[in-house]
Amino acid sequence: MRMEHLQLGQLGTNCYIVANEYGAFVIDPACDAQVILRKAEEMGVKIDTVVLTHGHYDHIAAADELGLEMVHLHEKEEMLYLNPEYNLSGHFGAAFFGKKQCVLLKDGDAFMGFTVIHTPGHTPGGICLYNEEEKMLFSGDTLFCAGYGRTDFPGGDFDELVKSLSKLNRMKSDYHMYPGHGEILLNRRKK
């Protein structure tokens, strides 16, 4: 498995390009589709699809510009992708209406060699993606190296976030964590 990391947009959103035996996909195409496509070309891969850890604008802004037919996201996150009131695009001076076909994911689904973990709280349909063999967790805005996602946006729920963090805390702790913002944490260990 190969992975490249890009930090994009006003908020320094972490965007990841992952290539494995299932194909190549982008996690959270924050903005600037051309930068993402150039990085994929440097990797020698053609991006097959997009997956969104959640539907906030700083994670979806380039989703419709990558020339792909569909995006994958949790079934409870579709309203954020489609509705600028919920995806917060107005805060960035835009009005983003998702235009791609949505493939709806659920907790426990397999996606391109990863397991989907539903982690509501920051948003209703937030997800993490976990690959046990590679010990990789893409945590979106659920969990960061030094904190967790905010819950004061529409659809946020602190009690749900606490449950999601507890779910992640029960996992094996020696995974590499790739969050939606900030530093990547290699070999996470419980303290």
Could you say what each language-model-derived stretch is?
Residues M3, I17-A19, D107-N131:
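Core dinuclear metal-dependent hydrolase active-site scaffold
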Residues M1-M43, C128-G140:
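Conserved beta-strand hairpin/beta-sheet module of binuclear metal-dependent hydrolase folds
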Residues V18, A61-L68, D109-F111, L165-K172, ...:
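Alpha-helix C-terminal capping segments
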